[in-house]
Regions:
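Gly/Ala-rich beta-loop-alpha elbow adjacent to hydrolase catalytic centers
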Residues: 103, 107, 112, 248
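RNA-binding accessory domains that recognize and position tRNA/RNA substrates
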Residues: 2-75, 79-84, 95-97, 113-281
């Protein structure tokens, strides 16, 4: 099945991760996604939200005290090498937190590298649809309901070749001997593939299994998010009027509609001529 998402390339230029928090979510259970600069970090959060659980995106150096409030943590992909001089700064104390943790792609390498495993460079990398083979025996809760052989989406130049002490290898591919692993006594997991993209057909099931493992309450809905965002805007405006410039495009119109006076909002439209939007005047 072809994905409608762009092909992932963890060697693409990195971007500076930013913290993101949905408004009006105080008291809600949430899963933290640490963004190592991969283009799918926010997609991971979106997939979790679609499962009914709030997900928040944080930078890799987010305060441990803040992450302790989460019910689980996912480490995203990223374009760098965990052993390189330009490796994304990361607080390894996160790996000791008492909650389920899942590393995906670069995040998988982070778990392996910081806990004593081995990550090395592949001569040709591993990209695109790849056949994943689960090892015989118990492969743990995240692969529950997943066939012993399945297709996954790989996109990496480095790979994990040796799991850290205390981890069991759960799956392999022709190029990656440690395509998935889990700790024997703690709910810590790593997967070299991208469970969050459409080209991993069983990815949704794997993420759902992880969310279930966290025990997070399913309180997130789009309606609740929208109302929370609007309430946050109202608090920030605090009774003042707001002038919003509209180009007539989808983004500005959608942003304006719920804030319009007819919707009891504070915004007043300021149309922008098309030639100004296109930089012609």
């Amino acid at each position: 099945m072809s994905s409608s998402l762009p092909a992932h390339n963890d060697k693409s230029p990195s971007r500076t991760p930013r913290a993101e928090a949905a408004p009006a979510d105080a008291g809600d259970d949430f899963i933290a996604v640490l963004d190592f600069g991969g283009q799918y970090a926010h997609l991971i959060a979106r997939r979790i939200r679609h499962l009914g659980v709030l997900a928040k995106v944080f930078p890799p150096l987010a305060a441990t005290a803040e992450l302790k409030r989460a019910r689980g943590i996912v480490l995203s992909g990223g374009p760098r090498s965990v052993y390189g001089e330009d490796a994304v700064p990361f607080n390894p104390d996160v790996l000791a937190l008492d909650m389920p943790l899942l590393g995906l792609c670069y995040g998988h390498q982070v778990v392996a590298h910081h806990l004593g495993g081995q990550v090395r460079h592949l001569d040709h990398g591993e990209f695109g649809k790849t056949r994943l083979r689960l090892r015989p025996g118990d492969t743990g809760p995240l692969f529950e309901g997943v066939p012993r052989e399945t297709e996954v989406w790989m996109s990496h130049g480095d790979t994990v070749v040796r799991a850290p002490e205390g981890f069991d290898v759960l799956a392999e591919t022709d190029l990656t001997p440690v395509a998935a692993m889990r700790h024997r006594t703690r709910p810590v997991f790593g997967m070299m593939f991208h469970a969050e993209v459409n080209d991993t057909p069983e990815g949704g099931r794997i993420l759902a299994n992880f969310v279930a493992l966290t025990g997070a309450r399913k309180t997130w809905t789009m309606e609740r998010f929208i109302e929370g965002a609007l309430e946050a805007c109202r608090r920030q405006v605090a009774g003042r009027n707001v002038l919003m410039f509209l180009s007539g495009g989808v983004d500005s119109t959608v942003a304006y509609a719920p804030q319009a006076p007819g919707a009891q909002g504070p915004a007043h439209p300021g149309p922008v001529p098309a030639h100004r939007v296109r930089g012609r005047g």
